[in-house]
Amino acid sequence: MTDIPRTLIICVSLHPISNQQKIDMQKNLVIVESPAKAKTIEKFLGKDYKVMSSYGHIRDLKTKDFSIDLEHNYAPEYVIPSDKKKLVTELKNEAKKAEQVWLASDEDREGEAISWHLYEVLGLKPENTKRIVFHEITKNAILHAIETPRDINIDLVNAQQARRILDRIVGFELSPILWRKVKPALSAGRVQSVAVRLIVEREREINEFVSEAAYRVIASFILPDGTTILKAELNRRLKDKEEVEAFLESCKDASFTIDDISKKPVRKTPAPPFTTSTLQQEAARKLGYSVSQTMMIAQRLYESGLITYMRTDSVNLSDLALGTAKEAILDTYGEKYYKFRQYHTKSKGAQEAHEAIRPTYISHDEISGTAQEKRLYELIRKRTIACQMADAELERTTISVGIGGKKEKFVATGEVITFDGFLQVYRESFDDENEKEQENGLLPPVTLNEVLSMKDIVATERFTQRPPRYTEASLVRRLEELGIGRPSTYAPTIQTIQNREYVVKGDKEGTERTYNIITLAQHTIKEVQKTEIVGADRNKLMPTDIGTVVNDFLMEYFPGVMDYNFTASVEKEFDAVAEGEMGWAGADRLPLHQGSELRFRSLFILWVRLPDLYDWAITTDLHENRFAALRIDTQFTLTHFMLRTDRGCLFHDRME
């Protein structure tokens, strides 16, 4: 009896499949990259199916070699790692048995590149190879993908290769310079070095910050009932002790009257569903997870079929997700709490999976798994449901207290929630104290022109706050704001700069500071001094000495590589390649940021072709103004070079 080719599947589903579908799929080989998906598929398909994994990329650039042919349009030189050769042989054997091969790696640029490498290495044929994608691991999603296959998107592959090649160029050309000039075994990278720059510059801002003092003045008034207290703040800060004392002196015999009461409705709108970066930020704030920890947990949830793909720029939700969210809201909270919202991704560069991160089954309010997985799943589910709920409605009341004819006023502001809406389910968190909304409660009832008795007025010396150090969450947000990196790069970038010991995440002890409190009560002004600890930080990112040295060296000699705009513009060029709007330089190979790329490539060539001169030149502070003439042909080959200093022309050469 002839054996029927066994099916190789690397995708996931949690539901049984019909006998007819089994017959159709038995002569198919389906490959994805994750062994966890394979394990789930085994439960889904049963013993009649052989399930395997490519375990990520099956080939890559050599680890220790440059592996890029600069003279031939940046052609990459790929190799199969020794630990993958046995697996590749097994995959080849299975592919030969199958009548149809389905490449089902993740739905992003990295996943597309994995499929392309599989296609090339396994020697697959276009007539019996299909590419399928799904952003959730469910029965319906997988079967729909098989019913609607496509070809490999070579534009996405080119975008991934362009990133890989440019990152290799920057890393392999800059790192040896750091070894020679700073310290052995250091590394530089197109994104990681810019991330370190952000942290170094923030630390310098903190060290150079000079705090300015001013007095915040708060009065406590007794209402006519004799017991109710109204607290209100002076509508300006007082600059020094003398001004405070003069103001309090003028208040000793002043009358205080309610001269204005205003009420206005306020609406709060829910945040969109999670993208990769917003999930990383919110998990750090609410759950205390590191960026890499969040992605590791989210990966497990995805591979278990519990959430959609976790590397995405998109805030879109599918029609199915919108419908199930509506059902969950109507069943639990009622029609008043539901509001349809269709979110659209603003960024043109949203190139990852085409849906936000959400539960695959929103009706499932609990899952099995570790405590960490349950907490992250609950966070994702609540955010998804909240984004389809009604606005919260509040009433904001502002009471103005006049001071006996003075232009200054005391102002009290309070909010009361009249309808909680989405706040019934979810409240968004903030990174820094100064971003947090004030939780002002309900104010006591007062009437216009009502006369109040002053209980006391307290002026407390306060100081301007220094810029906050970055947390992992706020660094992700800043990178995203600058257009640096993409969902797949945030976590590894932050992990890399810590592994390299350019940055540490740790605590910083504060310093003791003295401040004044001046009080007016019972016609008497009193002053006391108190102390407080300021500047203490917990779990913040701080540069190490070597991180600062490396940053300063790169900023001095390679400012183009370190420029925020350069790094962001390269990301846009990768996006353009992914959209098919531009090819690679030369033979459609590599998108070049012409100005900065040319500038730092010229320095690299000096180091590669003229190491002794380069070594001398850097030692004697080579800057752009020292170049008198520099000609580079289209292949970045040095043809003419002349170095000029204050003592005249020191070197002139021609290299064919």
PLM feature spans:
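C-terminal or mid-to-C-terminal helical accessory/interaction module adjacent to the motor/catalytic core
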Residues: I137-A219, K263-R267
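Hydrophobic, low-acid, alpha-helix-prone terminal segments
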Residues: L610, L622-L630, R647-M655
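Phosphate-interacting basic helix/loop segments used at nucleotide- and nucleic-acid interfaces
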Residues: V79-V101, L198-I199, E282-A283, L376-I385, ...
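Basic, low-complexity terminal or inter-domain segments flanking catalytic cores
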Residues: I10, Q26-K27, T40, Y49, ...
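Short hydrophobic alpha-helical segments enriched in small aliphatic residues
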Residues: V12, P16, D615, E624, ...
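Intrinsically disordered, low-complexity regulatory segments
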Residues: I10-Q161, F430-N434
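Metal- or metallocofactor-binding catalytic centers and their adjacent structured scaffolds
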Residues: L238-P273, E450, T460, N565
